[in-house]
């Protein structure tokens, strides 16, 4: 009896295996035919026009914002560049990027590694990769973005290239709704004092950088409704590098968001040195109940993508819960003291 059962199971398995293999083959052929039947799309980007056929499935991203945007669009790249900190991949992206191949640094990606991955789309930036764009294009269709701090543009461009425009539009729709809601809450809390002025300060080992409205973080704060107190901030590029503490007055604002570039002791010491300067003590933010907020360097500066930008909104919502009134009151007191 047992022998008969074994023979039956063996016959059943022998009959099932070809069927399973045939089903897998048919599924692969259907996907391939579906991709082939789609019309080629002409993607206009910073370095020209690239033809993309079907839906790319093997993506290599060569800058941080592109990696972030791919994950937001529901794509797991086959290759990514190393993160600037929290190496090799930012912590907030690790769950989505387990097992992904590293293709080198953003400043110097490995063409050999990229070629071995056999991608069907490469996403690059003009700032980092213009000189190797021709070589990248020989490996696979390549699109290049000019302004990598424009995270919404990155989502839109990648949505088109990846044949996920609907998903990109959905992401941006929810972003707009969230920003509108946050702006309304801040307006209601601050009243006539809104909008408040802001400075984004990043401390490094030997200098301070202040990020302007054209920067990644600056564009997010500007969209919410924050302003910069100095008109020239809107035309001075992405950031200003300050090496002399005599320039402290140029960063004056109602609120400071402070980033430390790394956890090196020299960075923390440099921050303490700037704080100890008499000119720092005269600034509005330190005077107003210490309206100086430490924030995550990855989310606010290095992520460069829509997911990182949403993490910024998380920070702002947490940090301003129940604190706006104290800012307003302190600023009123400062004005009264100035007029006496």
Pin down the residues of each PLM region.
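Basic- and aromatic-lined ligand-binding clefts that recognize polyanionic substrates
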Residues: 58-62, 66-70, 170-231
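Boundary at the C-terminal end of the N-terminal hydrophobic targeting segment
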Residues: 34-38
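Structured C-terminal subdomain patch of bacterial secreted/periplasmic proteins
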Residues: 255-340
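A short, structured surface patch at a secondary-structure boundary
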Residues: 66-113
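Charged, glycine-enriched surface loops/patches
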Residues: 62-66, 133-169, 176, 266-295
